[in-house]
Amino acid sequence: MADRRGITLACCGLLGTLVAETGIIERSYAEAIATQGVVTGTSAFARRMAQVHQARGQAPADVMQLLFPDNEARAQAAQLAFNLALPDAIGRADIKPLPGALQVLERLRAARCRICVITSLPRRVLDLALDAAGIKWRVDVTVAVEDVPRGFPAPDLVLTAMLRSEVATVQDVAVIHGTSAGVEAGRRSGAGVVVGVLTGPHPAARLRAAGATSIIPSIADLPALLGDGVTAPGAVPAAANGSKNETANTN
């Protein structure tokens, strides 16, 4: 599979790429900004939640700076509230791998392709989600926001994964993500393959604009894409029109 394309490292997003996520990210942001008086039913809440959706994939600290640009104290307080709310939400949620995710990881490993999970979320969230989904032992490397100077859309998470995995060249790397920030990070890293998945919060057009070389419906379509060197059955080439699958969200 992966070795036919020369891919030796697959950098996958977490929630919405490998792991199903039924809105817990945005609900956690809603809880966090409510601690700062921005509550449901107000225009301020609607405006900020629209900003949250657009900024999905970025580090929580960066998102809060976007939401409270003129008040550092409120931004930091909201970030702390988010960092408490999300692990609690994961602990209460039924976290499962997306359909086909486990099989894809097994096929990548069988093809001698190392697997890294990258996220702009905190390490505690990364570990909790991987443990809950039963994926952690299938992954070679994990990189969270604490491990890098900058989260997505900067390329730091991807580049750190490359360094830790000791890949020979960036052309041997595939980045798979469902947010425009994650896809842009893959493009800026120079990765040979940058795949947008439609199980995340952002539509195909936005993923293409961010630099996706291919668009696939879900992680389950990755083996055919990498193995054949062509778009997987049912996938949308990066230059073609595509529609959004409204099933999940990604970080």
Language model segments and positions:
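N-terminal helical cap/lid subdomain that shapes the substrate entry/recognition surface
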Residues: 3-102, 107
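Non-catalytic pre-domain segments flanking phosphatase-related domains
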Residues: 1-12, 232-246, 250-251
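Surface-exposed amphipathic alpha-helices with a cationic face
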Residues: 102-109, 162-163, 183-188
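Acidic, Mg2+-coordinating phosphoryl-transfer loop and its flanking beta/alpha structural elements
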Residues: 174-214
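Substrate-recognition element of Asp-dependent hydrolases with the DxDx(T/V) motif
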Residues: 29, 81, 101-131, 143
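Conserved Lys-Pro-Asp/Glu-containing loop-to-beta segment of HAD-superfamily phosphomonoesterases
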Residues: 152-180
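Short acidic, glycine/proline-enriched helix-loop-strand junctions
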Residues: 150, 156-158, 171, 203-241, ...
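A short, structured active-site edge motif that brings together acidic residues
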Residues: 48-52, 135-151, 172
